[in-house]
């Protein structure tokens, strides 16, 4: 049985839109793309690589897939371990209609997302890892399919842009299983989804 894990770059105010470049995702007139780049470091790159190398297969939304497919197949240096990992991995692509998938080892999950992902989780071992893919992740979270979240939080408030969790996301508590403080104020946190949140009161009897 696989676990479904999610990895995201995220701002202090929860924005995940266009972390890697100004033209990555301009939906809604978003003009702050590339906000991760000034804070990136060798230590962060190593931590991201360790996380992605845990994946047995990848699950990507169509937009993230297209961004990756425009770049990684062009990186052919065998010494680039991230390119080797991403190019060699099976990539399951979520899209409402069947897309043309030219990147090697890419497969459409089909029209029934929930059934397809449940089947993928049941058929193997290790991690089925969703990278970025905010719209897809929101759907998976609403379906109760996400087992873990790995978040790299950057010390920036963007004030606008698409946020990781929808306003109607189901309430969930999280168990912290891994934590590290990295260079330039970036934090690494890995959470396990732990069920419904509990509540209490500070009121005195």
What are these regions, as identified by a protein language model?
Residues 148:
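Acidic-residue sensor for enzyme active/binding pockets
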Residues 1-145, 155-205:
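Portal/gating segments that form or line small-molecule/metal binding sites
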